[in-house]
Amino acid sequence: MTWWCDGSPVRDAEGIIADGSIRSGKTVSLSLGFCLWSMSRFSGQNFALCGKTIASLRRNVLGGLKQMLTARGYTAAERRGDNLLILRRGSVENYYYLFGGKDEASQDLIQGITLAGALFDEVALMPESFVNQATARCSVAGSKFWFNCNPEGPEHWFRKNWIGRASDKRLLYLHFTMEDNLSLTPPIKARYRAQYTGVFYERYIRGRWVAAQGLVYPFVAEHPDSYILRGTTAGMDGAFYISIDYGTHNPCSMGLWCVQRTVAVRLKESYYDSRALPVSYTHLRAHET
């Protein structure tokens, strides 16, 4: 929360990105840090508090944030009709406008305003156009960007254009895990770890930007020899089935299976991708498994 303070080796960074697992303290740390920074560095300026929707922003951020600020001697007054939070402490007063970035049209709502900084809570849920418009509004000298999110897929625009270019953009990047949240008891952390599997475990618990593809059946990737039949399939006997995963715009896949009791072996397959292959082309491959 104090990376921006005098004496910090990263105080000149243009902003901060915090990603990682759920319940790791990202929202609390960044929202409080954002307000402490803005109230220490500016007075009479406009700031943006951005969430997926204004309702989720009020529910997930503002409630706890106002309590923490009040405990530190700040006065927080909210004008709900204007979607505005006014913070005061002594002679310092700043204005925090609430914005929802739920779709492409949301960028129109933030146009025109001049900002001294912006906080993006769950930025990975927002469209890129909204984030680009909001960051373009931060033209006051000394303004900074504050981002937090849970991971999505590896090709997500925020991972590629912001996390992947954090050094070029002079942004501080922090990765959070549940171990960073000292308020979570060991039983609660154990419950979360047991609650998810596959891609959801990788994203929510380990905080990794992973794709669902290839993780639907992770046990196959982890123990491939248990699922590959070595040798020839010639003369194999059993009940034969043809599986079809039909697609026109998406790939079409058909397979010839031999089922013996509880074991099913895919003998041959036909695969067609209309986006990659000529219309007249059909690929048939025999598995020597």
Where on the chain are the PLM-derived regions?
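Pre-Walker A adenine-sensing motif
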Residues: 1-11
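Conserved P-loop
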Residues: 15-78
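Inter-Walker segment of RecA-like/P-loop motor cores
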Residues: 63-113
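ASCE P-loop NTPase helicase motor core
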Residues: 117, 125-195
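Walker B catalytic acidic pair
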Residues: 122
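ATPase catalytic-site recognition across NTP-hydrolyzing enzymes
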Residues: 181-246
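Short beta-strand scaffold segments in enzyme catalytic cores
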Residues: 252-257
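Conserved small/polar residues in nucleotide/adenosyl-binding loops
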Residues: 282-289
